[in-house]
Amino acid sequence: MFCVQCEQTIRTPAGNGCSYSQGMCGKTAETSDLQDLLIAALQGLSAWAAKAREYGIVDHYVDNFAPRAFFSTLTNVNFDSPRIVGYAREAIALREALKAQSLNADANAAVDNPMADLQLVSDDLGDLQRQAAEFTPNKDKAAIGENILGLRLLCLYGLKGAAAYMEHAHVLGQYDNDIYAQYHKIMAWLGTWPSDMNALLECSMEIGQMNFKVMSILDAGETDTYGHPTPTQVNVKATAGKCILISGHDLKDLYNLLQQTEGTGVNVYTHGEMLPAHGYPELRKFKHLVGNYGSGWQNQQVEFARFPGPIVMTSNCIIDPTVGSYDDRIWTRSIVGWPGVSHLEGDDFAPVITQAQQMAGFPFSEIEHMITVGFGRETLLGAADSLIDLVSREKLRHIFLVGGCDGARGERNYFTDFATSVPQDCLILTLACGKYRFNKLDFGDIEGLPRLIDAGQCNDAYSAIILAVTLAEKLGCGVNDLPLSLVLSWFEQKAIVILLTLLSLGVTNIVTGPTAPGFLTPDLLAVLNEKFGLRSVTTVEEDMQQLLSA
């Protein structure tokens, strides 16, 4: 086992990465190794998908399957070894079909890729785990060095984050042939074990640029389907009655669940990154979407254990449900998996609803505590002139984007302390689950404009980017000249690709934490600092002073 993709990875003087019987996320060595095997199979599939496009052969099922299966290897998504192997088998079958079609078009069709002819050696998981050793990402570290390995992983993990957003967009009916062609090209190239530093750096920026397009179509899918989010108050306390909790990012799953629970007497609560759903008109119209439950994903083993109803996981992040003994009432959807828990293959939530009706639910309603969400792209752009007016009248000094992933590390209290230390004449724009560090606090307002503005899920960084570009255009300056600072927390691969997106757009002087990615060497961090001004957090006082004086 070797996995270094998330922020909680093991760090030792000898090197970084989880490499024992189990990773810090709870992933077993078996599952981790089989995920390496799956990635190799997907690289071979992409090699032939890219080749087939040269003959005008475009298989939309392959285009959907490839990033979706890749998404299953993202942190805290799928821990179920047989399902991982199932994805690998399907990838190989799809590859062979594309290969046959390509050979029909050109008898000399061929691809130069070591993954293009991969076959699984056995049906036995142990045999497959041993085969996977051939594809562990650090297998040639001694030959290429830590810097090249780090850049490969930066590209691989960044592309994995983009694949997750591609899947979210596809669920909402969004398809862009150019994006999929670019995805297959990059995925196939990474399967050749590239070792040119400049080419890898260029690839990382290409992934960032591609992801900006992915976020654009995801934004279109969400807003075209459910309307543009508008500021909405959400209760974060319990309401009496039967209940279901839904977590993850998939708004379509939430919509289907709301439709199927309407009139049943079962209330629905959002959790984690599903919180921004309350801002969408077509979702909040359901009166039994009663509120948001819990805090950051890392607290789920305590909070889910206390929730008196079933829980549906639509995407990341799931962690071991046996710890809180709620494994008999947690349900996984789509690419999510945990051994032994119930998995919903389709869009029918009837078994979940039946279980909710059989459980006690909340016995009484707690005193309401409202927070505000729903500052989507249209709302943010509508406030642009007001922001400029406040700046011109010296009522607004600075905007801090404080957001990103949450996690268990104690150093993440930095982000709470930073948010509460922001001066009263400054605004906080936030997004993603990192907001749970401070989103239940009262930050007041500046002339009626809330000082804490929740822009949505991690992918809604797109809205923040569009706002920044709009403000810069109106003020006749560059984005980096705005009174705007980005203080980002990271945990997994979606955060990595958001960072690559920002860097590829030329955004500089971003501050990240709580730690640097374990796969980035000091040399690589120095390159990113020199080229983009990217740096790690220090202390709240030092960072605040530096950002306000920049």
From Swiss-Prot:
- Location in or out of the cell: Cytoplasm
What are the GO cellular component annotations? cytoplasm
A molecular function (GO) term: hydroxylamine reductase activity
Q: What is this protein called?
A: Hydroxylamine reductase
Q: List the disulfide bonds.
A: none
Group of enzyme by EC:
oxidoreductase
Report the Pfam families cross-referenced here.
Prismane
Gene Ontology biological process: response to hydrogen peroxide
Major subcellular location class:
cytoplasm
UniProt remark on cofactor binding: Binds 1 [2Fe-2S] cluster. Binds 1 hybrid [4Fe-2O-2S] cluster.
Organismal lineage: Bacteria, Pseudomonadati, Pseudomonadota, Gammaproteobacteria, Enterobacterales
* SUPFAM superfamilies for the chain: Prismane protein-like
Tell me its family: Belongs to the HCP family.
Q: Which residues get modified to Cysteine persulfide?
A: C405
Q: Which UniProt keywords apply?
A: 2Fe-2S, Cytoplasm, Iron, Iron-sulfur, Metal-binding, Oxidoreductase
Q: Which Gene3D superfamilies match?
A: 1.20.1270.20, 3.40.50.2030
| Protein source organism | Enterobacter sp. (strain 638)
Q: Which residues bind hybrid [4Fe-2O-2S] cluster?
A: H249, E273, C317, C405, C433, C458, E492, K494
Q: Which reaction does it catalyse?
A: A + NH4(+) + H2O = hydroxylamine + AH2 + H(+)
Annotated EC: 1.7.99.1
